[in-house]
Amino acid sequence: MGSKSKILIIGGTGYIGKFIVEASVKEGHPTFALVRETTVSDPVKGKLVEKFQNLGVSLLYGDLYDHDSLVKAIKQVDVVISTVGFMQIADQTKIIAAIKEAGNVKRFFPSEFGNDVDHVNAVEPAKSVAFAVKANIRRAVEAEGIPYTYVASNCFNGYFLPTLVQPGATTPPRDKVIIPGDGNPKAIFNKEEDIGTYTIKAVDDPRTLNKILYLRPSNNIYSFNELVALWEKKIGKTLEKIYVPEEQILKDIQEAPIPINIFLGINHSVFVKGDHTNFEIEPSFGVEASELYPEVKYTTVEEYLDQFV
């Protein structure tokens, strides 16, 4: 291994971004974060930026919507990782244009970190808003011939497990649990820190070049029924189970306002259609993170749930 790539994270103060920034530093990469001047004075994000600086992250001032600042930032690094949020996914064409102009980027990771958007059976509006928009970015990256890795990290633990995906809940269920569909399709759950670690491990790895990196650690693959059974075992109590048939879920999606209909649609794709696990990873397009990096001690779902008991 030569020297470690210099990494720029765009969207580093966001939900998954901060974990990737921290993992990059931890793995010994010269780490850069693109931040807006206004972010530094923001009461919440400003503290995060300060934390980054204390870790040794270099701040580069710029903006997704300021082409020259993007090019200038990108010219200083080898690898660009985008973790921009939901509303800015489509605007990553601006990053693609800047990477193209800069001409020095060895790898681009667009903002993915969810389902593999080329293997989804989603209904509208999630189909377009959550998935197609990311697939369009993939096609744009490929059309420009930019070297890439797409990270399909499936479910963020922090979004799904503290409530066991119960609508409107803030804690896991103690009496009854609502289960979408028949509860049998398998989904995959990963802790955010582990997503950061696996993403950074892939940066200089030739095996992940122009591939989808799937996070499918064997101990984190659960059907909804298995997840509920694990939780029942932990709390020593049997819960009343309410199964919601797919027809009802589809009706709920049609009737719910934005953005609830999008989240319901993502849940439908994951827990009813089984879009995390209903296809095999072919070597032609993908690799699996826990196989590539067996040295990573990832947090299992079982360990993660202990904090809520």
UniProtKB/Swiss-Prot annotation:
Q: Does the keyword Nucleotide-binding apply?
A: yes
Question: Key word NADP present in the record?
Answer: yes
Q: Which residues form the active site?
A: 134 (proton donor/acceptor)
On tissue specificity, the annotation reads: Mostly expressed in petals, and, to a lower extent, in sepals, stamens and pistils.
Alphabetical UniProt keywords: NADP, Nucleotide-binding, Oxidoreductase, Phenylpropanoid metabolism
Listed Gene3D superfamilies: NAD(P)-binding Rossmann-like Domain, UDP-galactose 4-epimerase, domain 1
Pathway of action: Aromatic compound metabolism; phenylpropanoid biosynthesis
> Which residues hold NADP(+)?
13-16, 35-45, 86-88, 111-113, 134, 154-156
Kindly report, in one word, the top-level EC class recorded for this enzyme: oxidoreductase
Q: Which Pfam families does the record cross-reference, listed alphabetically?
A: NmrA
Residues carrying the site annotation Required for activity: 266
Instruction: Provide the GO biological process annotations.
Output: phenylpropanoid biosynthetic process
The EC number of this protein is 1.1.1.318
Purpose: Catalyzes the synthesis of the phenylpropene eugenol from coniferyl acetate. Phenylpropenes are produced by plants as defense compounds with antimicrobial and antianimal properties, or as floral attractants of pollinators.
Name the family.
Answer: Belongs to the NmrA-type oxidoreductase family.
The name this protein goes by in its record: Eugenol synthase 2
Gene source species: Clarkia breweri (Fairy fans)
Q: What is the lineage of its organism?
A: Eukaryota, Viridiplantae, Streptophyta, Embryophyta, Tracheophyta
